[in-house]
């Protein structure tokens, strides 16, 4: 059997195991998936093997089928509205498990990959054992947690004993990662109000209040305001929060914009003794090209560039950075990717 066919057969098997009416459920999903309806999402009625029926969003059904596709076992309980996701750990012989409300899968579609990677949901928190570092704990599951802790996309920087300015700190995942790797202090900058509040909770859950300093703001080359807009927590990781007035129009939800100079002065960051991390969906162009005098003060940089989204060239950034840094792309390509730079 071709390897590319096997995952889809698992998804069909999963539908048969989860639902008594698996055939019409799959038909409804297929019609939606291939755009054969004008409805962008919608719901489907599923009938569980333990009795009862429940309506779930098609986006939730997609996550359930994906779970089976990647090798998890999913069991749906129509009575409680919960799903049990189970994955056998072939290394340790243990089971990774998550028992979660079905509606939570709609906003946390990274859940199947998390369970497969070793995360466990105890009904309240997501936890994962990190070799040599203990257990990390988070309120919700998002894709960036897997990128940071499972893929270790930020492993290239040497943070032990250093100050780290973490721009685009989201819910604290990267800040907590840096703290566990021995950072002396992490200044975690996040403009989205709900993501920022969740970051505060996650910092407390991991007992890192003495290491991580949260800042509810965005980074820019000039002080002022940036526009948040009507963006969810999950969507903010793929949204460029532009300075207010950028592109015209009013903005109902704003957050303060801070500069590197302000952060350096306020927190006593010493030149040559700090790391700058940026994952701010485009602000790297503004900061590197328009505030380079402060960028060059950092010992190492690691940032995700978004050249395609910003309709700019990666070469613009590298031409400026190559004045003082040795830079290399550690993942991605010309359109989007992660750049690591060390000061000469």
What residues fall within each predicted segment?
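Phosphate/nucleotide-binding beta-alpha loop and adjacent structural elements of enzyme active sites
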Residues: 1-344
């Amino acid at each position: 059997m071709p390897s590319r066919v096997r995952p889809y057969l698992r998804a069909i098997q999963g539908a048969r195991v989860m639902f008594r009416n698996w055939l019409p459920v799959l038909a409804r999903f297929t019609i939606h998936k291939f755009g054969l309806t004008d409805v962008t999402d919608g719901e489907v009625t599923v009938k569980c093997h333990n009795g009862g029926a429940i309506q779930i969003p098609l986006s939730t059904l997609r996550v359930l089928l994906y779970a089976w596709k990647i090798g998890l076992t999913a069991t749906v309980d129509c009575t409680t509205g919960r799903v049990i996701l189970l994955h056998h750990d072939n290394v340790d012989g243990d089971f990774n498990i998550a028992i979660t409300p079905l509606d939570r899968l709609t906003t946390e579609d990274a859940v199947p990959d998390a369970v497969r990677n070793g995360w466990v949901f105890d009904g309240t928190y997501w936890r994962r054992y990190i070799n040599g570092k203990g257990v990390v704990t988070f309120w919700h599951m998002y894709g960036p947690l897997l990128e940071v802790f499972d893929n270790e996309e930020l492993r290239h920087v040497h943070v032990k004993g250093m100050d780290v300015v973490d721009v685009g700190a989201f819910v604290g995942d990267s800040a907590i990662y840096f703290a566990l790797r021995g950072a002396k202090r992490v200044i975690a900058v996040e403009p989205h109000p709900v993501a920022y509040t969740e970051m505060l909770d996650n910092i407390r859950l991991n007992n890192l209040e003495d290491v991580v300093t949260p800042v509810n703001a965005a980074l820019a080359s000039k002080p002022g305001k940036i526009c948040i807009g009507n963006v969810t927590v999950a969507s903010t990781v793929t949204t460029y929060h532009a300075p207010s007035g950028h592109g015209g129009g009013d903005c109902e939800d704003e957050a303060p914009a801070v500069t590197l100079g302000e952060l350096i002065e306020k927190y006593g960051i010493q030149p040559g003794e700090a790391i700058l991390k940026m994952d701010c969906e485009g602000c790297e162009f503004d900061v590197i090209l328009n505030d380079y005098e402060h960028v060059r003060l950092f010992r190492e940089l690691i940032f995700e560039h978004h050249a395609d989204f910003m309709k700019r060239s990666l070469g613009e950034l590298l031409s400026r950075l190559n004045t003082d840094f040795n830079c290399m792309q550690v993942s991605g390509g010309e359109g989007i990717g992660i750049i690591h730079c060390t000061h000469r």
